Structure formats: structure tokens, C-alpha cells
């Protein structure tokens, strides 16, 4: 009998539904969740883009790193978007996107660290868990068991069943970004844009600005000289050819801009 049986039963009986994406590890958690009766009440989709080419296809791009927080956040944001498309009857507040990337012990010695990342995207927040193993200390099965535990703990917390991940360990870093009300309105399509200025932007400079660098500033200054208009940096939170931005990514992007730069958030994925 699974040690997670009662927790998973409560997940299936909760009012939440979710899409779960796993790459490089975490498939044991999917198995644990699906083998408990009632999984169709909560699981909308479980997807395993295991090969690098499969993850490229899922993200519509080749990520800088296949096992990283940024990649996992993108996967979770896309999973949440998929949940909203699959289940149009459930309120977005009751839908979740969960993703995990992992680099675990295998049949050869890895150069990099053994680690995993879990991200949960919801209507109101993004939640991330970054964990680094002590390399060579545990077997693959032992590492996978820890990944499974954290996925189920994080998921049960997101479903309101318990407090979720409560571990106090230097191996783990937890970050939660709560969405501003305006971000939620933009995601829900209730407003068309959010601007750092009270003025309607006249000159738009679109880009991901991940990160913002001196070249962007030089282009902005040149555009202002040629047009006489003050440019606003546009960050599209949901491009046609990219996964949506998580709240982590939205916050990190807008915090780059000093008060001397205007910016605007939109959902205008196409011109």
C-alpha cells in the first residue's frame, strides 16, 4: 500500500483539477497519483516529455538548460494554460499546472549536480521548489523517492489539503510569488494592458528583456531620437510561439526597469 494513499485520495476528492508535466524525473509521482481510484476527478492530463527533443517541442523552443527553475516555471505556466483549455467549466481558481524537471543519479557519473525543480502555477500565484542533492550520497531510487514526496506534498498544499512542503533543509529553496490584482485581470482578459505610466504608450518596444541589457537601452534612445516619442518596453505575457510567463517571470522582468523606463504588460502575442 502506498504511503501517500490517503493524501492522494484527498487530492482526488478536492475541488482542484490539474495538468502535471514531468521531465527527467518525477514519473513515480505520476504513477502514485494515477493508481489511486478517482484520478479522473483531479488529473486532466499527465505528460512526460522525457527526451530533449520532446521538451523542445513542448516548450516551442530549446531551453538554455533542461533541468532548471526557469524551464520548470515555463512548463508549469504552459500546463496551467492547458488546464484552462481542457476544462472550460471549472473556474481558473480551481485549476493548477504542475511541472518538474530533474537531473538524478543514472548508470554513468554525471558532471553536473543532482537536483530537481518543482513549479506550480495557479490563478493567483506561482510556487517553486528547488532542491539539490549531495552528489553520490543516494541511489537513483532514493533520489526519485524524494522527488515523489515533494511533488505530492506540494500538490496537496496547492489543493488546500494541508500546509504542503514544510521541510527545513539547506538543500531546499522555496519561492512563492503572489500575483498583483492587475496581473490576474490581464491573464483573465479583463484588461488589455498594464502600464507603469498613466500615459497611453505611443511608441512600443516589444521584447522578452530576459535580461534587460545596454543594447536595449541604446535601441530605445535611438528610437526616441528618431520619432520624438518616449518608448515603452512591452512585455507580452502570452506569446503565440512561447509558453505563458509565470508570475515569477513577470515579477523578475518588471523589477529590472528603473523609474526612468516605462514598461507595459500585454497579451498581444501577434501584431
What is each PLM-predicted segment?
Residues 14, 37, 73-76, 235:
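Conserved active-site segments centered on acidic
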Residues 9-14, 53-60, 234-238:
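A short, surface-exposed helix-loop junction/capping segment
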Residues 57-85, 251-265:
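Short, structured active-site "lid" loops
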Residues 3-6, 10-29:
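N-terminal, charge-rich interaction modules
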Residues 23, 27, 69, 73, ...:
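Electropositive phosphate-/nucleotide-binding environments in soluble metabolic enzymes
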Residues 19-68:
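Glycine-rich, small/polar surface segments that engage phosphate groups of diverse ligands
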Residues 3-5, 30-32, 53, 86-271:
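Nucleotidyltransferase catalytic core that binds NTPs
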